[in-house]
Curated annotation (Swiss-Prot):
It is found in: Secreted. Inhibits L.terrestris digestive chymotrypsin LT_CH 1 and bovine alpha-chymotrypsin. GO terms for molecular function: serine-type endopeptidase inhibitor activity. Residues 1-22 form the signal peptide. Monomer. One of its GO terms (biological process) is response to wounding. This is Chymotrypsin inhibitor. Expressed in the body wall, coelomocytes and at a lower level in intestine. It comes from the Eukaryota. It comes from Lumbricus terrestris (Common earthworm). Keywords: Protease inhibitor, Secreted, Serine protease inhibitor, Signal. The record marks Y62, D63 as: Reactive bond.
Amino acid sequence: MKLLFAIVALLALAFLCADISAVKTSWPELVGETLEEAKAQILEDRPDAVIKVQPEHSPVTYDYRPSRVIIFVNKDGNVAETPAAG
């Protein structure tokens, strides 16, 4: 019985890990795109995302929030750095 429980627990853990790894957490392909294009793509990939927009090189907090995606934009309104969750 203990062996069966261990096998079920391992399978459940493997399923959870596989599910987590499928979640997109960064968008390097959006660098140079417009803010609106970036927002649309991120929300398509991650409907749970809470998007924050910051000017390029601005300070941010270092608390970790898995659903938060910060988009840094340059003076032209284009994505300046890779948007990433966290």
